[in-house]
């Protein structure tokens, strides 16, 4: 028997919405694997709480977390690859403020950094291929993966 998946994307810091959605799904379907296809942060009000919730949810549910462009922008900023301007122009201001410490400095908890860093670029099951974005319609899936790496 093949796996049954629930794919969820573009939460964008809306933790209350995703909590309610997942509560309803879990009540009805106990045997699902959850594939979150990225964009957990930015634009919405509660990026930090969203990540806390997803980490906690994954402790009792089968979850696969993919990286969206918003997580990549946060990692690029955190790792010093790009400036904050690019990230904030693309909705990162709310997330930046969520992670500000009492000294008004950006502080990403290690557990959250680890979560972002360990997201996958894609997930390939026996029947489905999951990705946030970036596949070239002119190429096969294999060629697109090779080009991205």
Predicted features along the sequence, with ranges:
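N-terminal active-site segment of His-dependent metallophosphoesterases
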Residues: 1-53
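Beta-strand-turn-beta hairpins that frame and shape the catalytic cleft
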Residues: 1-6, 123-129
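Hydrophobic/aromatic beta-strand patches that form the interior of the parallel beta-sheet core
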Residues: 6, 35, 64-66, 129
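Histidine-centered divalent metal-coordination motifs
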Residues: 10-12, 69-70, 132
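Catalytic core of the metallo-beta-lactamase
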Residues: 13-16, 124-126, 133
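A short local structural element in Rossmann-fold oxidoreductases
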Residues: 19, 75, 140
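Active-site neighborhood of divalent metal-dependent phosphoester bond hydrolases
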Residues: 43-126, 137, 149
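Cytochrome P450 core scaffold surrounding the K-helix E-X-X-R motif
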Residues: 139-145
């Amino acid at each position: 028997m093949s796996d049954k998946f629930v794919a969820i994307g573009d939460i964008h810091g809306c933790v209350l919405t995703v909590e309610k959605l997942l509560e309803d799904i879990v009540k009805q379907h106990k045997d699902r694997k959850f594939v979150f296809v990225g964009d957990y942060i930015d634009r919405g009000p509660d990026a930090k709480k969203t990540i806390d919730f997803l980490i906690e949810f994954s402790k009792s549910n089968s979850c696969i977390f993919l990286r969206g462009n918003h997580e990549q922008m946060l990692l690029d900023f955190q790792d010093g690859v790009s400036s904050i301007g690019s990230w904030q122009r693309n909705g990162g201001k709310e997330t930046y403020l969520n992670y500000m410490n009492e000294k008004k400095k950006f502080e990403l908890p290690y557990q959250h950094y680890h979560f972002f860093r360990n997201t996958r670029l894609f997930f390939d099951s026996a029947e489905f291929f999951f990705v946030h974005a970036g596949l070239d319609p002119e190429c096969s899936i294999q060629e697109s993966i090779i080009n991205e790496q």
